[in-house]
Amino acid sequence: MDPGVSSHLRTASLDEARRLPELERVLKSGWLIKKGHATSTKKQLWAVLRRDQLSFYKDEKEYKTKFIFPTQDISAVAYYKEKSPKTFFLYLNEKIIRLIATSNEDAEEWVHVLRSTTGYRAPFSRHPISYILANSSSRTESEPNVQISDTDFDNISTEPRNQTTSPLDLETGQGDHFCTSLYDLIQFGKLRPPGINEENANYPFNPQEVNTLNKHRHSASLQNLYKLLDENKVLMQGTIHWLHGNLHRWSKCWAVVRGYGMTIYNTNREYKPVKVIPIADIQDVAEINVPESSHKYFFTVITQNKPIEFRVDNEDSLILWVAALKTSIDKANGTFTAC
């Protein structure tokens, strides 16, 4: 075997050996009651949280697992302390799990540990230049397009437009569209242009070959994003639907996300807000997965008192709304700071 290859394999084995103990380390364990959809259905199980998964056993002997939830599948944790101090909810990819702890203090500890371990916290791409899917030549005039810019906020709209994209000039950054550093908030490859398969999306896009990706007119650095948050400038805005009222009806509205929270207006004139959700009142944000065939995309803003559900038109918008809100939460909690 080539000495270089042998050395590489030994290094990889050592890295894996160091990683395994960390994955096996128990972050928290204890009894939890898992409640089903029916009020009478509940099971007391022994729960064990490790870095990569939350496991449930019949008892503390941990002989056989009853349920396993990978931590990467837990997108948010909801805890309504005033209403139900022992109860918290896990938002998973396809369902919501209700859990009841043995005491108020135990519930708070579970929530704290889970939030520090699970869900995505607006990860950043290591690619030196930030890109985003700004537009696609395959769109039609009737399809809405969300334009985002951290400098020309008046240009942000969801109005239909009919423009074609042009190849990007890497030296000047010129192109038909501009995009925000919000791309840095989402897992690399989650947004990708039509025609790019998932395997190719795992690598940085080549802007010379993919004309739908455009360089930001200014640096999309973390410092720039931190400034946007610090000055409460617009991170995301557009037309969405929200579920509200005693009859739980869907209403079309104009929403704006800034560092201090989310504001909802009747129209994009932003004359008078109909609802303001301060960032301090938002626990977390979660995507709600529904069958892909339904062509509907939802996310929930989990406030201190209740969840508020929103609907958007496409998956790209869904990712950006969630990313903008997640980052505002991270800034408020001190998780996200300028590098």
From Swiss-Prot:
Disrupted gene: phenotype observed? Leads to off-center septation. Does not affect its3 localization to the cell membrane.
Which compartment or compartments is the protein found in?
Cell tip; Cell membrane
**GO CC term (a single one):** cell cortex
Domain PH residues, every copy: 25-119, 233-330
One Pfam family in the UniProt entry: PH
Cross-referenced CDD domains, in alphabetical order?
PH1_PH_fungal, PH2_PH_fungal
Q: Where is this region: Disordered?
A: 141-170
For the biological process aspect of GO, one term held by this record is: mitotic cytokinesis
Q: What is known of its domains?
A: The PH 1 domain interacts with membranes containing phosphatidylinositol 4,5-bisphosphate (PtdIns(4,5)P2/PIP2).
What this protein is reported to do is described as:
Binds phosphatidylinositol 4,5-bisphosphate (PtdIns(4,5)P2/PIP2) at the cell membrane.
Q: What is this protein called?
A: Pleckstrin homology domain protein opy1
* Protein encoded by which gene: opy1
